[in-house]
Curated annotation (Swiss-Prot):
This is Dihydrosphingosine 1-phosphate phosphatase LCB3. The gene is LCB3. It comes from Saccharomyces cerevisiae (strain ATCC 204508 / S288c) (Baker's yeast). Changing K128A: Impairs dihydrosphingosine 1-phosphate phosphatase activity. SUPFAM superfamilies: Acid phosphatase/Vanadium-dependent haloperoxidase. The lineage of its organism: Eukaryota, Fungi, Dikarya, Ascomycota, Saccharomycotina. One of its GO terms (molecular function) is sphingosine-1-phosphate phosphatase activity.
Length: 409
């Protein structure tokens, strides 16, 4: 029993691919952010701790209210619907789906999405680690998800909400700028975007992953990222800093600076890995754009958007395997071999792995608590950054060459 709740048989794992997992953690200190205030007071600056204490007012009593709402609408169909639609905010979804607009002639739109998504992920991860606020507790909630990994992050802000907000605003902005479309078509497309948005955002509450503060703060981050991207894109159209020789150095340096100076959480939280991935993608697409404009590599800019279903299918059948082969087959062994064997960087992965092993095999009361912050190996940060920077190179530089050779450009 925990706070009057029966905790027997409280963790239910899916037995088939189609069924989501139902997680409850009776030892709530195993989830980050749930320790008493003294745990954070000694590990935070006074300013940071005071902000956290003020925000706790919005999270302390949310779990039972959210649990009643979840119980009211819980069904097998909703479990499947909201867990699988949540994949539209997942890491793998972006790896496979973000390249597609590039192959159909929408490179600039993809750049907009990469900037908005990349900085939404970074800022939401930064504030998660800065505030160290807990997710709603389960029990009384059920965390309905396809992966236990995501349940071990802090709560606010919601990165799913930040992404959905920024991208939905971008879609709506582009829809209402389509002068060749009728108002009826624009309204229909807007309804589709809003349906996507409501599904992704309210799904976070239904799945027991986030509370109201998480959604509001995530939404604000998405709005800010959209406004900043649009402001710089249209306010300084003639600046063209991406055409200067130093721009790739600045892009890579800026991305790595943001990552190596990222705020340190108090407890272990895996969301930093997504920040590394997206900062790599941002830098990668900037460097590809620079190569295209400085050296005249224009194949990606010449791809025709209205190409018919045969060419559309052909580009997908050629482009997607290229991305999968780079990301999931050759990139990791190649990049780590170069970093360790050629550039002689120290491989510090074993040190972090040993610390994690020790943290998860504690004796006594401490084995019922999440470990304190251990951090990512420096070689993993650099390696992951380069691997994900390689995804835009595969999409923007390699795939259009293959399209041209196969006469599907």
């Amino acid at each position: 029993m925990v706070d009057g709740l029966n905790t027997s048989n409280i963790r239910k794992r899916a037995r088939t691919l189609s069924n989501p997992n139902d997680f409850q953690e009776p030892n709530y200190l195993l989830d980050p952010g749930n320790h008493p205030s003294d745990h954070f007071r000694t590990r935070m600056s006074k300013f940071r701790f005071n902000i956290r204490e003020k925000l706790l007012v919005f999270t302390n009593n949310q779990s039972f209210t959210l649990s009643r709402w979840q119980k009211k609408y819980r069904s097998a169909f909703n479990d499947l619907y909201f867990t699988y639609t949540s994949l539209m905010g997942s890491h793998t979804f972006y790896v496979l789906c973000l390249p597609m607009p590039v192959w159909f002639g929408y490179f600039e739109t993809t750049k907009d999405m990469v900037y908005i998504l990349g900085y939404s992920i970074y800022l939401s991860g930064f504030f998660k680690d800065y505030w160290c606020l807990p997710r709603p507790r389960a029990p009384p909630l059920h965390r309905i998800t396809l992966s236990e990994y995501t349940t071990k992050e802090y709560g606010a802000p919601s990165s799913h909400t930040a992404n959905a907000t920024g991208v939905s605003l971008l879609f709506l902005y582009n829809i209402w700028r389509m002068q060749e479309s009728s108002v009826m078509v624009q309204l229909l497309l807007s309804c589709v975007v809003l349906f996507y948005y409501m599904t992704l955002v309210f799904g976070r509450i239904y799945c027991g992953m986030h509370g109201i503060l998480d959604l509001v703060s995530g939404g604000l981050i998405g709005i800010v990222c959209f406004i900043v991207r649009m402001y710089f894109k249209y306010r300084f159209p003639g600046l063209r800093i991406e055409e200067h020789w130093w721009f790739p150095l600045f892009s890579v340096g800026w991305g790595l600076l943001l990552l190596f100076k990222h705020v340190k959480p108090v407890d272990e939280c895996p969301c930093f890995q997504d920040s590394v991935a997206f900062m790599g993608v941002v830098s990668g697409i900037e460097c590809c754009d620079w190569l295209g404009k400085v050296f005249g590599v224009t194949l990606v800019y010449n791809l025709e958007p209205n190409c018919g279903w045969r060419l559309t299918l052909a580009r997908l059948l050629v482009g997607l395997p290229c991305v999968v082969i780079w990301k999931y087959v050759i990139s990791k062994p190649m990049i780590y071999t170069l970093l360790i064997k050629v550039f002689h960087l120290k491989d510090d992965r074993n040190v972090a792995a040993r610390k994690r092993l020790e943290a998860t095999h504690k004796e006594g009361a401490s084995k019922y608590e999440c470990p304190l912050y251990i951090g990512e190996p420096k070689i993993d940060i650099l390696g992951r950054f380069i691997i994900y920077a390689g995804v835009p190179f595969t999409v923007v530089m390699c795939s259009p060459v293959l399209f041209s050779l196969l006469n599907i450009a």
